[in-house]
């Protein structure tokens, strides 16, 4: 059964599925869809067009689906889409997209977004991502599955964070972070393969060994990046992880942290 606290304000056009709960002093605007089993705590503001999937947990004072923080934005109907089973903690801000980039900000499933974090317009987040407190993305940032951003990590617009990457506390990231790697510092620099994280996700020694080999090729061999990439592509024909690394590098517009 859907339960809406009498002190909440829910627009009549908002669509709340079965089992949704809405806490006191929360405001849900028009053109909002909330999936079954989602719990929206007190003092939350959700503006549309926004779609939330099933079984999300929205904690107090989160701002979901407000206008993009872009001076060019002129009120166009852009969107925010959030998948299933996400945890969005206190004071998180998730902004809608802008028309210049297709009008969509998207979060996938099972992400853990801790207090005071910010996801700006047109960002695309995959699944199983963790943001520690006050991690912030500028606009147009892509974050792949299983990435972790430490507290107060800051990511420049148009950067990409690769799958299973770990970005340390306070990192300032102005270029793409390769999948499977760790970076930290101001300005952030790479520090090797994310061995601890990969082991926690069940990756075996041989798989990690091959990734370390690829890391040495890219960062320690002294080769030009184009030459290292060609060699990595050959290795990737028999290794999906290395194939993903090569494709990630080839698709980079801002360049990689190196």
Swiss-Prot record:
InterPro entries per UniProt: Acetyltransf_C, Acetyltransf_C_sf, Hexapep, Hexapep_transf_CS, Lipid_A_LpxA, Trimer_LpxA-like_sf
Coiled-coil region: none
Similarity field: Belongs to the transferase hexapeptide repeat family. LpxA subfamily.
Biological-process GO terms, alphabetical: lipid A biosynthetic process
Quaternary organization: Homotrimer.
Main enzyme class: transferase
One Gene Ontology term, aspect cellular component: cytoplasm
Function: Involved in the biosynthesis of lipid A, a phosphorylated glycolipid that anchors the lipopolysaccharide to the outer membrane of the cell.
Pathway terms, separated by semicolons: Glycolipid biosynthesis; lipid IV(A) biosynthesis; lipid IV(A) from (3R)-3-hydroxytetradecanoyl-[acyl-carrier-protein] and UDP-N-acetyl-alpha-D-glucosamine: step 1/6
Pfam families registered for this protein in UniProt: Acetyltransf_11, Hexapep
UniProt source species: Alkalilimnicola ehrlichii (strain ATCC BAA-1101 / DSM 17681 / MLHE-1)
Reactions catalysed according to its record: a (3R)-hydroxyacyl-[ACP] + UDP-N-acetyl-alpha-D-glucosamine = a UDP-3-O-[(3R)-3-hydroxyacyl]-N-acetyl-alpha-D-glucosamine + holo-[ACP]
Protein name: Acyl-[acyl-carrier-protein]--UDP-N-acetylglucosamine O-acyltransferase
GO molecular function: acyl-[acyl-carrier-protein]-UDP-N-acetylglucosamine O-acyltransferase activity
Main location per the UniProt record: cytoplasm
Enzyme Commission number, as recorded: 2.3.1.129
Subcellular location per the Swiss-Prot or TrEMBL entry: Cytoplasm
Assigned keywords, A-Z: Acyltransferase, Cytoplasm, Lipid A biosynthesis, Lipid biosynthesis, Lipid metabolism, Repeat, Transferase
